[in-house]
Amino acid sequence: YADLELPETMARKMNFLRAGITLPAPADSAAAARLSELTTRMGSSYSSGLMEIDGEMVDHNELENIMRTSRDPEFLAHVWDGWRRAYDPEQMSTDYAEMVEIANQGARDLGFDNLAQMWLSNYDMPADEMEAEVERLWGQVEPLYQQLHCHVRANLNELYGDEIQAAEGPIRADLLGNMWAQSWASLSDVASVSESGPAYNLDDLLVDAGYDQHQMVETAESFFTSLGMEPLPDTFWERSLITQPRDRQVACHASAWNMDYEDDLRIKMCTRVNGDDFVTVHHELGHNFYQRAYNEQDVLFQTGAHDGFHEAIGDFIALSVTPEYLVQIGLLDEADMPDESADLSLLMDTALDKIAFLPFAVMMDQWRWQVLRGEITPEEYNEQWWALRESYQGIVPPTDR
């Protein structure tokens, strides 16, 4: 249909139908079954990896919390490396390479050169223009990121000394408060700005107010109902995974689900009572309320306007968790409302989360696009991954990779 002159709405529907699949299965049924088998095995391996610490088997969710809160560099390096060895990395690499081969065939069956081109076609512009636009936008933000990187590196050097973190060059990935160094939000104590006045600690506010995980989600729901939106359905509370199950391992990465395109909305998240997760809950419910908003659309339009729109909605809501909002919901006493002298601290907290994430996101897609185009071979996966991480993020692993 690409060469047909279709009405704009019909052409958009056809593009959603053709390119709206993350991993397209080939027409061959055996290959399609194999693709499903591979993705299931990799997902299960990723979510069920355990690491022994002090005689106890610790899961990924707890390891994430350790990375967030510990300031012991030897222990951080041990946890960082141990989690990456908790599943079979060689098998994961082999499975991933086979998945790439099969999914690329599925993309070719749909008329694309490869899966990278298919993914890049979902942003209302030609694939090559989208890739160039990503680099253009990153070029605008990169100088600010470099300044943030320099500031955080200097503070880490002051905290740990030259032997752990050099005053110049890349930052050790395990010191950045996150298993993937994709958000540095938990480093607010390390990256504090001396010129700034007193702010607040959202972790402490939640604990002092006696919040539990469900109350965090209820508060996020109230954000939306205060705007005139209908409350979430009872099934949301019955069917969502809000806390980590005790009887099984699950993938704890936060996600929002639209199960029936009517009103069966859910989240899946191993929520902890801390500021990061409080913001994330608002982000995830942003997805849910957006999903509900388009459930009345034609079936092929029951999705995000394009592949970037859902995350824009989620983060727009997350950025609304401001001091003024915390006062409105009673978490922050109005007398403790930070004045203008605290603006630097609040802006730094935002930068540690949002600005620090951007080179990770660009690097991740650059690696995937190059893998899918065959520019990075399976034998080069790890080497090129870390080359891109150092180039974009300015980070290096704490152990040999």
Task: List each model region and its residues.
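Long, amphipathic alpha-helical stalk/connector segments used for oligomerization, subunit docking
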Residues: P323-R401
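Short pre-active-site segment immediately N-terminal to the catalytic Zn-binding motif
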Residues: V207-D212, E262-H282
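Zn2+-dependent metallopeptidase catalytic core
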Residues: E133-V152, L206-P233
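Post-HExxH zinc-binding segment in Zn-dependent metallohydrolases
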Residues: V134-L144, G304-A342
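Active-site recognition of the HExxH zinc-binding catalytic motif
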Residues: R272-Y294, E311-L319, W367
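Short beta-alpha connecting loops at secondary-structure transitions
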Residues: R266-K268, D298-A305, D343-L352
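A well-structured
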Residues: Y1-D204, P398-T399
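Catalytic zinc-binding patch centered on the HExxH motif and its immediate surroundings
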Residues: I66-M67, S222, I242-D264
